[in-house]
Amino acid sequence: MNISLIKSKLLIAILVISTFLTSCASKKDIVYFQNAKSFETIVDTDTFKAKLKVGDIVSVYVSTLDQTVTQPYNLVRNTGGQGELIDYLIDVDGNIDYPVLGKVKLLGLTVEEAKNLFKKKFADGQLLKDPVVIFRVLNFRVTVAGEVNRPGVYPVSGERVSILEALGLAGDLTIKGRRDNILVVRDFNGTKTYTRIDLTNKEVFNSPVYYLTQNDYVYVEPNNSAISGASGDARIGNLITITSFLITTALIFITRN
């Protein structure tokens, strides 16, 4: 009987079993858009635009050919010798207190709708002729937490950001992040909604939370492999020890007979 050959085979068996016990993740747990076919076209018909909320901080800049007539609207504060355009907080009633116009209700409007509202008010009151209105949300940010490489709060410069873009800002998911059950927490005027999204399915593009709104919270939970690793390292170690013991016992029995 070739004892060396038996020892080699048993050693290989131990290594294979150890690898099997410690490797739980599979391709289907990691790859995005798994049911998307090659060269398949998905038309983005979503015209989603974030709506203004209570607590949003906005800036409104008005311009006309005659800049002198817009000065009462473009109030500035002096910061270090430089003029900085004053911003406005949307109050609990959904209004801002704007120069000359007074209370302006912005709650629930998109940025474009807010621009048009100001233009209409200037026109109706015969205050400005053909004004250009630049309206921005200054505190548009999203929070990404959990199993991502760079969790944190990320400012957004545009009018909308997709969940994929937000995860990209956070350095993408770690290998331990669960891709099929990402949680998006959204707060609109005190009412919170909780929506799950599956990045492994191409239908993610049709999700109502594919495009995020200001102050959305994105949480990536750990996958089963990570959970098992956190709570089951000792258990796996015990299984490996027991397996090794049984194989060693078998080896001793074989060599003695």
Model segments located where?
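Ser/Thr/Pro/Gly-biased, low-complexity, turn-/loop-rich segments
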Residues: 2-6, 20, 24-257
